[in-house]
């Protein structure tokens, strides 16, 4: 049983977050290890394993990038330990330029405002790539979706760097 089936959801990228959360709570309640306190050792172990699977499934499905990777894994495309790199020189150049721009934010006259503007730009870029990913997954364009996920991972790392710079400015 895959994660979507576990939660009674259609196997697709777009999902109803509130339905996912309510299904998660119901499954958590049903398979909580405390409910099996008087059960046999085997049943208690199975309950713990089931609870762990429910938690893993929820963490995967609630995160758009992890959900997309999981959808690809259902198609036989594994990205977790992949050695394939992104082959888009324009995108990679843009990422280098963005990182340089982020490094220069602290030297601006108003670094907080510069960081907010930079973050807004990166967030818009992230939304753009997520929309493209959604379309590619809906059209079963698995390899294009895999490339899009790679791009989104670069952007996620950049967003983490933005948070790091923000912490420096505030700290």
Curated annotation (Swiss-Prot):
Function: Co-chaperone involved in the maturation of iron-sulfur cluster-containing proteins. Seems to help targeting proteins to be folded toward HscA.
Organism phylogeny: Bacteria, Pseudomonadati, Pseudomonadota, Gammaproteobacteria, Vibrionales
Keywords noted in UniProt: Chaperone
Keyword Chaperone found: yes
PANTHER family associated with the record: IRON-SULFUR CLUSTER CO-CHAPERONE PROTEIN HSCB
GO cellular component term of the entry, any: iron-sulfur cluster transfer complex
Sequence ranges assigned to domain J in this UniProt record: 2-74
Metal-binding is among the record's keywords: no
GO molecular function: ATPase activator activity; protein-folding chaperone binding
Organism the protein comes from: Vibrio cholerae serotype O1 (strain M66-2)
Name this polypeptide is given: Co-chaperone protein HscB homolog
Quaternary assembly: Interacts with HscA and stimulates its ATPase activity.
SMART domains: DnaJ (SM00271)
